């Protein structure tokens, strides 16, 4: 019978035999040249005469080039038929898709003997000569010093097999495609003693002959069986304990996959909790070994089939030694579950690393494996693989759920030990699979484990970081969070997207309460504006929008901000700020009745009567004069916005003795309408002169008066006139002082909201000036008398508009007053959410209110009459809101039925009507009122 003789790890494949696992495997890493004693003498294993060739590259270092090992010929050779039989059984097992729960009977003896060999204590007399120096120098010494060449100087506790993998459940190649029942070494063993397997009665560096046999897959206790074969995408492995399918010897055993009839053994030691040494995984290759193949392919560390780039040996050794010597480092003791793997850190460099074990919360459980999913052990790993990022150190209790992508290679993570300071990382691309949207760390006792939710574009969710600040090092917090900061102040969009992490990982939302800056509520119009009265957005106009009970609570006029809590009129105890002045309730009621009743009080003395708590009812004339001098304005509760200096000046005026004689009316009016120190009334304010200069010219409607009026022709002419007036309003507003300082969107909004008010107000002014309010003077070529109004289809609407010129006639409105009121009409309606240039808008409106007061003072020569005049004019402005609402409703109905009514609407006017009138009629705008209804 032909026998197969193995000539080392580079032995070619024999036809008809099992395929050599080394052939065709990608070049992943350098071979681990640790002294893994895998040969067993005939005394130790009488029934087994060969060691699997799959362990040859791991257990025995490759000889130097040109060196022919003397023990190349085997003493006990295994027949090819046995190898083929073992291979056929492995094929049958894999084809059946099942997994053996216990090793075959033939292998049980081998397992026991191997365990006896592995677990036997190493005596001083068992040290044997080490392999040649070339083998030692070519090894990878990542977790300890190189083995000395001197045999006596090599203690049994110095193992050099580099455990590079933390996830050992890999493809089994020709063996069973599942992770078989397995056992592990005791956790009490240190990593070095676990890796070194001293053979009782056999040399450490024995050159015993070997025979090829199928390589077993190295498995681990935390991997599930039933993982799919290499042809399909298997589910993500969970870190769960599995029942051991064999007798445990001494608390640990070596894993023996089914199909390894030749006694192939792959040992995967469990790491000690006191150390951070990762675990080793051996992967079986599928193709025969080609002649001349580098020995690097003989040992295939499963790096999820990611090409391995060179590693800095000195850096790895130094970092590993630092972690091993660190007494405060805890290798996963703080994990919530006893089976949770130790904490891992992301590899931020472009060097390839192995995928560490992820806890159960890292991935959402899949009901069934999906073919289109990205398994951890597929030939291609997409960018969707996340790397959990976590701060190292005993004090690091807050972990970051954000993950990043390794630059230059498919992402992976070194388990349990971080590399040196990494270069900056680019943000990870959004995940392509929702289930893999985030990888969170196992929750520690004082840490927060969650995943950030999807970002949203509108809000900055700040999260409050719990726990101690992370230490400075290679895994410092991301740039958006300063070390030790209490929260991330950057928008969520700037962070990597982990949209499905909150739901998939089962994160508790209570762990991340959304906070604002400095404990304040989150900014935004929806949170601060949409309240009745809009107190947050329009502080200058709170007096017009809120009742006295609310106005008395203004922080600017709280009692704490005033020097005294007395009435500025009579000296009694003040009850609040009424009509802009701190007064008592009696003076408040007196002033309101005196102004609304339009009483003409006369002083029996010389207008210098003493007004105090006892004698305040003796002379109502002097009491009213004193109210006006203090600054009380009926309906002008807005004027309590005057600063504290103004109030102190009023207090000083009350404290000083009144001058003897009748005070000058102009001085009293100046004291009443002075809004800033040194600003007195002028004869013609320059702003009013400017308003006169920019007033639009007369606009014609283009109506044909020779033809009889019809409903459609009259409405069409009015629409044409409205289009021209709308263009005139736009041109006029651009020349208006202060209007161009507003945001362009605010300018458009104000014009669209107020164009109807401006048109009907201009109609009333023209009707008042040209025809004394007897007719509706739309344009020089379109004047409707009462008869034409009755013949029209909108007679009731004409009566409504006719009220404005009649009111002008009653009040005898001056041009200066009209110009100031016209500007205030432009600024009397705003959106509910406010304007973008809210501050500039408030300043502009306040300035034109002052101009209106100046315009009133040009003709009114008395304080009482001026206050009454201001009340009447502002009341007219408030009444225009209801009148214009009727016009809006009629205009919208006509626009909707324009085809049926044969009424034409110009283009610009149609756009404004369609876009804004439904919103205005639905109450989605906020009118600014001077008086409470």
Curated annotation (Swiss-Prot):
GO molecular function annotations of the record: nuclear steroid receptor activity; sequence-specific double-stranded DNA binding; steroid binding; zinc ion binding
Cross-referenced InterPro entries: NHR-like_dom_sf, Nucl_hrmn_rcpt_lig-bd, Nuclear_hormone_rcpt_NR3, Nuclear_hrmn_rcpt, Progest_rcpt, Znf_hrmn_rcpt, Znf_NHR/GATA
Cross-link (Glycyl lysine isopeptide (Lys-Gly) (interchain with G-Cter in ubiquitin)): 388
Positions of region (Disordered): 1-256, 331-378, 415-452
Residue ranges for the DNA-binding region feature of this UniProt entry: 567-639
Compositionally biased intervals (Low complexity): 232-246, 335-350, 434-452
Region (AF3): 1-164
Entry protein name: Progesterone receptor
